Curated annotation (Swiss-Prot):
One of its GO terms (molecular function) is serine-type endopeptidase activity. Residues 1-20 form the signal peptide. The gene is SUB5. Secreted subtilisin-like serine protease with keratinolytic activity that contributes to pathogenicity. Gene3D superfamilies: Peptidase S8 propeptide/proteinase inhibitor I9, Peptidase S8/S53 domain. CDD domains: Peptidases_S8_PCSK9_ProteinaseK_like. This is Subtilisin-like protease 5.
């Protein structure tokens, strides 16, 4: 009998290892959070199983700290639309134990995400006129609904909500970085101004909600971006705004299965999600969240309808939008000009908010509508890349 029990125990242990969740690697050269990991549970994990798993992880972590090993344990928990997971700081033995739980889908290192922006000299805001005129022009033509009733979640470096561009339509939502409700880089304020500013914005009546996930250097961990998406979905659901919301992420980093997975769930929940393609002049399939096929991935165009030299390209790109020398709001008042796919993505978010208000279409169907309205005018867009440029359908 003893021999039988020994064999059974060994068999169960072998089965556990065989069924262990994959611990994903990050691309070479990616900047990672030391000992930081993201854990994603399988879709069929119940709330009770998830709770039990977290209690078990806490117990493991408690034993680790009792042994004098460093580790912070679980920091953020994600639980929405059957997406359950968490992130934290763990030693390698703990991560190995976690990956052996059959309820875990995968584990991946927590990597650093960065904003996609360059600061350039001041110039006129040509992007607005370009997206409302088939053949160019200097006037911005739009319907008076102008995004009224639509909420825009700016998952970024924060927003100067008191800037006159927002006319009281901007609020702080969540700060996942620090205790400073401010924009340390100017990036998020510029992005928000393009989406819904009174002068520089497309959807001039939309509401801006600041979700701070990037620090004063324009960086943040993947786990923090996921937490920002999680918060945005829950907030929109609580206020009955899921299908009348857009979420913009002008940021990106190395490929992340976890970030792509959670971003896709935001769209499945009913939101429109625009993301920047990246500024490395490479295939955007290598980046996240740009490589997630269900999002609207936006590359950057120039004033003469060319591909911006820095813009990423590839089959993951859905549209081009103005991204070179874009004038918009800056913290503290006034304006500044920036370039990058970070500037292209909010043009798409703004037109998305505009169309949701004007045509009444739900957020998760807007990317298709944007592609239907777009025009094939981009010259030399890149290998296996669309030539279609964002257009608001004004008829001009």
């Amino acid at each position: 009998m003893t021999g039988f029990l020994t064999i059974l125990s060994l068999s169960l242990a072998a089965l556990s290892v065989t069924n262990a969740a994959q611990i994903l690697s990050v691309p070479q050269g990616a900047e990672v959070v030391p000992n930081g990991y993201i854990v994603v549970m399988k879709d069929d994990t119940s709330e009770q199983d998830f709770s039990s798993h977290r209690a078990w992880v806490s117990n493991i972590h408690h034993n680790v700290t009792r042994r004098g090993l460093n580790g912070e344990g679980v920091k953020e928990t994600y639980d929405f639309d059957n997406v359950r997971g968490y992130s934290g700081i763990f030693d390698k033995d703990t991560i190995k134990d976690i990956s052996n739980d059959p309820k875990v889908a995968f584990v991946e290192p927590d990597a650093i995400i960065k904003q996609h922006v360059f600061v350039q000299q001041r110039k006129a805001p040509w992007g607005l006129s370009r997206l409302s005129n088939r053949r160019g022009g200097r006037n911005y033509v739009f319907d008076s609904t102008a995004g009224n009733g639509v909420w825009a979640y700016v998952v970024d470096s924060g927003v100067d909500i008191h800037h006159s561009e927002f006319q009281g339509r901007a609020i702080w939502g969540s700060n996942l970085v620090d205790n400073k409700n401010s924009d340390g880089t100017g990036h998020g304020t510029h992005v928000a101004g393009t989406i819904a500013g009174k002068t520089y914005g497309i959807a001039k009546k939309a509401k801006i909600i600041a979700v701070k996930v990037l620090d004063s250097e324009g960086k943040g961990p993947t786990s923090g971006i996921i937490a920002g998406i999680n918060w945005s979905i829950k907030h929109a659901r609580q206020h009955g705004k899921l299908q009348k919301s857009v979420l913009n992420m002008s940021l990106g980093g190395s490929y992340s299965a976890g970030l792509n997975h959670v971003t896709a769930r935001a769209i499945k929940a009913g939101m429109f999600v625009s993301v920047s393609a990246g500024n490395d002049n490479i295939n955007s399939n290598n980046n996240s969240p740009a490589s997630e096929r269900s999002v609207c991935t936006i590359a950057a165009s120039t004033e003469n309808d060319g591909k911006a030299s820095f813009s990423n390209w590839g089959p993951a790109v859905d549209l081009y939008a103005p991204g070179h020398n874009i004038l918009s709001a800056r913290p503290g008042g006034g304006s500044q000009t920036m370039s990058g796919t970070s500037m292209a993505a909010p043009h798409a978010a703004g037109v998305a908010a505009y169309l949701i208000a004007k045509e009444g279409i739900p957020g998760d169907r807007v990317c298709l509508r944007l592609k239907q309205l777009s025009r094939p005018t981009i010259r030399n867009p890149g290998p296996d890349t669309t030539s279609r440029l964002l257009y608001n359908g004004s008829g001009r």
